[in-house]
Amino acid sequence: MLKNSKLHFYPVVLFFALFSYSQTSNAELVKNLEQFNKAVAKVKPGGEIVLADGTWSDVELVFKAKGTPKKLIELKAQTPGKVIITGQSNLSFSGEYLVISGLVFKDGSTPTGEVVSFRTSKDDVANHTRVTNIVIDNFSTVDRPMSDLWVAMYGKNNHFDHNSLVNKRNRGVTLAVRMNTEASRKNNHLIEYNYFGPRQILGSNGGETLRIGTSHFSREYSNTTAQYNYFDRTNGEHEIISNKSSGNSLIKNVFFETQGTLTMRHGHFTKVEGNYFLGNGKPNTGGIRIINESQSVSNNYMYGLTGTRLRGALVIMNGVPNSPPNRYDPVIDSAMNNNIVIDSSFIELGAGSDEERSAPPTTSEFKNNIILGNTVFNLYDDMSGIDFKGNLLNEEASTPIKSGFASTPYDVTVNKYGLKSPSKALLDKIGFGEVKLPVTKAETGASFYSKKEAIVAFQSGKTINVKSGTDTILTALDNSSAGDVLVLENGGKYLLTKFAEVHHPITIMAKKGDKPVIRSLKPNFINIENGGALEVENLWFDGAESPDYKGNNIINTSSTSMNINYSLSVRNIKVTDLDVNGYFYFFKANAGTFADSIEILDSEFINITGAILQMNREVDDLGVYSVENLTISGNTFKDVKEEVVTLYRGGFDESTFGPIVTITDNKLSNVGKGSTHRSGASMYFHGVQKLNISDTTWDNSAPVSLYLTNGEPVTMIKDVVMKDTGKIRANNDGYKTKNVTYK
């Protein structure tokens, strides 16, 4: 039975109404760093330092001052949104009773580990300080694996509100509450009404949007409240909020199509209440993951969540007996009550159960929840330590739990707020109240900053007709803009004497008919650079003019790190005679680059000395990989000496969804049998999280090779024929097969 006496929460001391007191005297306008430093040195309580409108480049602003509760000291923009801080810049501040507002950090990066820091040194922190109405947008180092924090909160009794944090592209937490000294514990911070805008998939651990604490201090109390924030497709990794300390309240936030979960990774006495998770059927969208002791999860709403395993709609994990702080404390004395789950895929109980995580939940409860739709309950261990009572499940659904669930009709309608809602009668049964977002997107973020995205789709721009000839493709690329379409002549002949560099989304294609032939005098035909994305259709790439080098390729990614995810779409192309020397690849993904999607469709590859897709350059075994979604469908591969695909995700990290690979309806003939071929496979997959191979034939080819790692990978190979081809090789039997025929 739940020990209610343990479910207490430390009070949050709200001093923030003090900031409504307005000071307008003693304002000093500063126009450069020298003037700023002089103003800081002499500012008094009640003073204002005003940054002049314009661009401030390569500035490290250090703001040390002490106001009083009735005489705050302000640092602000002359006009909110008109002070643009860029280049190698950052802002740090310490003292007390400070207000910072109206600044925009855009298209730069920090020279240190933090963009906005609530301290100026280890011992000098900010207390009773408010940061409001600021923006950080694309303030990311180009070095994708380099980690930094956009906002680091130290000290106590600080307020971070109505800010917009958008487009973080490199590793590191967007907003982190730091607790590395006593001066920053039991901090009573308030984080509210912020807009956490889209964050691309990082492809590794270290992409959290909000983290409170770390494993080192997870049993210390932070007493931080995060409320009324809007998380908009913050897809960096699967821990959108990573709670890693005790006594925190995560209440009335909205998670819109976020790939990941609100995760109680470490710490106890967490209050998770009144949050809305809107998955809308998008891939990998998750809800709440419960770990540790005395957690309270109540009155949350979950709709259209598709995540599985550790990323389900509601996940209760197994723990480690006598766990060290950096692992998984068992779920004890916790409550999951009065929540609504609609049209979501999975509820996972005892998730992560293995030899180490062998402790199931105990003295916990799961009561008065409404679960409607085709939700699957997965049980991975004994759940007798959870008291199930008063839950409602629609009549068509089922659960392996024997008691505590009553059947009810699937009574769901779209209410006046545009949300799927159970009937009022069902809501009244659990005392949920009206289904309504606690905060809207428009109510969050900096008041002056648009939330409109600048996404450019393929073929959304103008058409550029490209005549046959030497370097005409290069000229067209130089004159193109994002979304443009380069249309080549049917049957034309094109020669490249320089690298074709792609710096924005572009389509190179020919209309239906004879394919134009593209050859190159350079070792690489096309380089996808940072910001680029490429679509090719109805083309013929031929290696006859390529130089006599090992390691040539048709398409590759930048040799330096790219912090903007790219995509590659290949449809109905022909690739021939990549054989002037060894290891001539069609596509090579270099380290430090990442694709949201790669698709190879309805194409033909003949006489290739390298691999078709080489994506094995992330070899540090830290859970880093090269592509999130890979699709190979409807292709013919003949006389390819290496693999059709080699894809590597090393290490044991569980923080990502991908790689996700679909291979269907392909034909392989004499593939993977080159005398210098290193893996000895026609397809090689290491650490892939989800792999489906179907309706594909092999003839006189090397086998498929699998290396399955942790993270509960799902691998299915079905309806395939392997003639004169070796049997599937794997390091363990954690994969499934169906209708695999060997001849």
Question: Language model features by range: what are they?
Answer:
Residues 401-469, 479, 723, 729-743:
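Surface beta-loop-beta hairpin patches that serve as ligand-binding interfaces in beta-rich domains
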